Amino acid sequence: MEEIERIREIERTEQEKIKERIKLQREKEKEEELDKYTVECPECGSRALVRDYERAELVCSECGLVIDENFIDQGPEWRAFDHDQRMKRSRVGAPMTYTIHDKGLSTMIDWRNRDSYGKTISSKNRAQLYRLRKWQRRIRVSNATERNLAFALSELDRMASALGLSRNVRETAAVIYRRAVEKNLIRGRSIEGVAAAALYAACRQCNVPRTLDEIAEVSRVSRKEIGRTYRFVSRELSLKLMPTSPIDYIPRFCSGLNLKGDVQAKGIEILRQAAEKELTSGRGPTGVAAAAIYIASILCNDRRTQREVADVAGVTEVTIRNRYKELAEELNIEIIL
């Protein structure tokens, strides 16, 4: 019996060694695969490479070196000149996305009662199609976890649409929320609160800052709960978020006030001078940005009132008056009202 046990132990050890070797081999192959796609310029080491599809060349945008000639075009073999042509000729589905609970990998049955050729489904087959559509919806969301994730991601998309946020911000917010779900951070907290906190964190990560008041306005939870949940999630997920800079708010505020490009450039210049003298630290970034825009609009003869700037920035007129007086005094800016 002891001999049999010893043989079995040796066999188990050998099997573990084989598994370990296979695992190491797979990791090595994965690293080689990644190295194949992370190309850098052999001359200057830059990764800012541009693919010129007309000449079939891979060019470094920093030093101009042609790294590869006659590379293979991995795009479609067909040509399309508008959106309708692209939709007709495309033979693949939408790209994978984190903003859908199943990452967009499942299929769905269209609500229109038409076949693949665009012909109307006969009346005797509509009942069957209705049942197929119903079961397809049930299969896509099969358990409570998927149902909650689908609800949270739809809530994220609704808030992002209301704030006019871009696709990359939505994807980042969805990834943050999924990480929170994996770490079981949702327990004891509302789904809407965690979704709003994830969106706020994504805005800061993507340098498209939105204030807590703006997030709270489009969500169904209070500003206090969003702030508390955001601090908890960012701490547990170790999110590296830099403090928001007033400069990040300048383009959006100028766009809301219909100001010209020179006013925006002047506002950024004022804020950079203020940052050098540490006038922006310890103050709300929206108030400082609003004051810089107010000063820039006067200097560029494209004046806006304090009330107009305050409405767009979401601050009070008193805040703008206090901040612009500080900036004008410390930076020696002469303002003629």
From Swiss-Prot:
Gene name for this UniProt entry: tfb
UniProt family annotation: Belongs to the TFIIB family.
A single GO cellular-component term on record: transcription preinitiation complex
Superkingdom per UniProt: Archaea
Source species of the chain: Methanothrix thermoacetophila (strain DSM 6194 / JCM 14653 / NBRC 101360 / PT) (Methanosaeta thermophila)
GO terms for biological process, alphabetical: transcription preinitiation complex assembly
Protein's name in the database: Transcription initiation factor IIB
Transferase in keyword set: no
GO MF terms, alphabetically ordered: DNA-binding transcription factor activity; TBP-class protein binding; zinc ion binding
Pfam families assigned to the protein according to its UniProt record, in alphabetical order: TFIIB (PF00382), Zn_Ribbon_TF (PF08271)
Sequence repeat feature ranges: 154-237, 248-329
UniProt xrefs under HAMAP family: TF2B_arch
Function of the protein: Stabilizes TBP binding to an archaeal box-A promoter. Also responsible for recruiting RNA polymerase II to the pre-initiation complex (DNA-TBP-TFIIB).
Zinc finger map (TFIIB-type): 37-68
Residues that, per the record, bind Zn(2+): C41, C44, C60, C63
Keywords, ordered alphabetically: Metal-binding, Repeat, Transcription, Transcription regulation, Zinc, Zinc-finger
SUPFAM superfamilies, A to Z: Cyclin-like, Zinc beta-ribbon
Matching SMART domains: CYCLIN
